[in-house]
Amino acid sequence: MSDLIAVVETGAYLAKATRIMSEAERSQVVDVVAARPDAGVVLVGSSGLRKLRIRLAGRGKSGGARLVYWYHSPGFPAVLLWVFAKNEADNLTAAQLKRLVGEAEWLIEDFGGKR
C-alpha cells in the first residue's frame, strides 16, 4: 500500500460539503483522495485541477456530487476546493472555473511547484 498524502479542506469546500454530504461521506472523500490523489480527471487548462465523481448515499444514480480539487505531485497535499451536487449543475461555470484556476495557481506558487 502506498503512503497516504495530506488532504486540506478549504473553507469554501467545507461550507458546501456540510450542506450536501454527511460527515461519513466527507470522511470517505478525504480517505479516497489521500490514498489516490490522481484519481480525478484533470480539467484541461486548469493548472492541474481535478474533478472526481462522488456517490452520495440514498440519492440514486443522478444524485451524486462532483469534487474539484488540486493535486500537483508527490510531496504536495491535495487541496479540496469545491464540491457541487449533480442535480445542481453538470459542470462548473466559466466564472467558477476561472476563480478555482486562480486558487490553483496561487497554491502552485505558495508550495513552490512548477506549472
Q: Where are the regions a protein language model picked out?
A:
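Compact soluble domain cores
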Residues: 12, 21-41
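Preference for short coil/turn "hinge" residues that link or interrupt alpha-helices
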Residues: 1, 14, 35-37, 85, ...
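Arg/Lys-rich, positively charged N-terminal/basic patches that mediate binding to nucleic acids
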Residues: 1-24
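Amphipathic alpha-helical transducer elements in NTP-driven molecular machines
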Residues: 23-26, 62, 97
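Basic/aromatic recognition patch in beta-strand/loop cores that engages polyanionic ligands
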Residues: 39-83, 88
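Enriched for short, Lys/Arg-rich terminal
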Residues: 3, 71-115
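A generic structural signal for short beta-strands and their flanking turns/coil linkers
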Residues: 9, 29, 46-50
